[in-house]
Amino acid sequence: MRWLPCLAAVVVLGQALGSDEKLSETPALTNPNPRINVIRDDASAIRWKIDKQRVDGMVEAGLLQVTGSENPTAGWLSLVSPEDTVGIKVNAGPGQISGTRREVADTVVRGLLKAGIPSKQIIIWDAKLEDLHKAKFDTLAKRHGVRLAGSMEAGWDESVVMDKAILGTLIEGDVGFDPDEEKDSRKSHFSRLITGEITRIISIQ
């Protein structure tokens, strides 16, 4: 069996939101012409074992395709700057194998550090810190001196709200959740990580 890491456009970047904003669900928030680059290497993982060198090559190839840059450092600096706080969004909940692979996140972190992004301004984040620890992202963070953060632990910014068209039931961790009473809401609040700290987001799924 082979596990194949494929990177769709390598990374998905977006500028984080400022505070005191209210968002509505509107086509203006989406890119009508998204660009997707898929990088494939069948030998990048065999029997769940990751070939780090091949993963490095995949990320580099995708980065250069997306940015049109001559080298990886120039590619990263065309997307972020040393003044940014870069949030690397991972999917830690499914665990070490089914979720975001640490080897891919490691390649991205090393690329950002080489491009001059200070380690204290790189945050690996997901919904819960507990999930990040279970998936061993804490070892990656310690190795490079970058930070770990969870949206739930950071809290939600009640001044930045997106109104959704579909009514949803509040769950544990949501603003307004009450374990003794079922509540519905169309409002979605953004993490304080996004509204108050992170200025660029790299999503690795």
Segments from the language model and where they lie:
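N-terminal and secondary-structure boundary signal
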Residues: 3-7, 14-205
